[in-house]
């Protein structure tokens, strides 16, 4: 068994940091050491910001985004086209699409995808909220922007079935060759999807 080199407070910090996605035990140890060394400049302000986030952050009751206000900043932005809703699996997907800056639409966060094998059904996701938003009227288009996985496709089909008969155009993100991608490095499924989604130039 390895000898302890720090007190329980620093060990607890390391253990908690190791739970953050992208940080393993080794990276967490380095991050903790850096924070402790920069106690005044980093650790204090970080602890304060985390406490503030813990107290104020909530889930938007309209779209499922995380923010300090409800409805969130995205939902209350009057410059957005509220008649177009981009449906995403997770808040991280919403943020990624916003960074791309390609559309100025509203969003709806599902909170995952349907996965019967994992026991995740429609009632475990924010699908009912989406159906209610469309049923209220005023939604012209739904862009389903879920991952190109079996679960993502299942979720997209389920949503489409639930909205059958409603006056809304339902589209999906195109799948295929990434910008800067070389065909030789792509898998067969991606190439097949790219061929099916080909466009006129």
Swiss-Prot record:
PROSITE patterns found in the cross-reference section: RECR (PS01300), TOPRIM (PS50880)
GO biological process terms held by the UniProt record: DNA recombination; DNA repair
Function: May play a role in DNA repair. It seems to be involved in an RecBC-independent recombinational process of DNA repair. It may act with RecF and RecO.
Alphabetical keyword list: DNA damage, DNA recombination, DNA repair, Metal-binding, Zinc, Zinc-finger
Record's keyword annotation contains DNA repair: yes
Toprim domain location: 83-178
Name recorded for this polypeptide: Recombination protein RecR
SMART domains for this protein: TOPRIM
Record InterPro entries: DNA_Rcmb_RecR, Rcmb_RecR, Rcmb_RecR_Znf, TOPRIM_dom, TOPRIM_RecR
GO MF annotation, one: zinc ion binding
NCBIfam families documented for this protein: recR
Family statement drawn from the similarity comment of this UniProt entry: Belongs to the RecR family.
Zinc finger (C4-type): 60-75
CDD domains named in the record: TOPRIM_recR
Record's keyword annotation contains Cell membrane: no
Source taxon at top rank: Bacteria
Taxonomic source organism: Rhizobium meliloti (strain 1021) (Ensifer meliloti)
Pfam families, alphabetized: RecR_C, RecR_HhH, Toprim_4
Alphabetical list of PANTHER family matching this protein: RECOMBINATION PROTEIN RECR
């Amino acid at each position: 068994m390895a000898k302890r080199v720090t007190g329980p407070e620093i060990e607890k910090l390391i253990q908690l940091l190791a739970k953050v996605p992208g940080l393993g035990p080794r990276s967490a140890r380095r991050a903790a050491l850096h924070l402790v060394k920069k106690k005044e400049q980093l650790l204090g302000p970080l602890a304060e910001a985390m406490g503030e986030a813990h107290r104020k952050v909530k889930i938007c009751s309209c779209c499922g985004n995380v923010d300090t206000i409800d409805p969130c900043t995205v939902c209350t932005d009057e410059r957005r086209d509220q008649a177009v809703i981009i449906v995403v699996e997770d808040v991280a997907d919403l943020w990624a699409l916003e960074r791309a800056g390609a559309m100025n639409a509203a969003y709806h966060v599902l909170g995952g995808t349907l996965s019967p094998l994992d026991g995740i059904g429609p009632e475990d996701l924010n699908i009912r909220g989406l159906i209610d938003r469309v049923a209220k009227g005023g939604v012209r288009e739904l862009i389903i922007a879920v991952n190109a996985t079996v679960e993502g496709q299942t979720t997209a089909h389920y949503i489409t079935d639930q909205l059958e008969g409603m006056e809304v155009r339902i589209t999906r993100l195109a799948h295929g060759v990434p910008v800067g991608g070389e065909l030789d490095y792509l898998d067969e499924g991606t190439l097949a999807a790219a061929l099916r989604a080909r466009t006129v130039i």
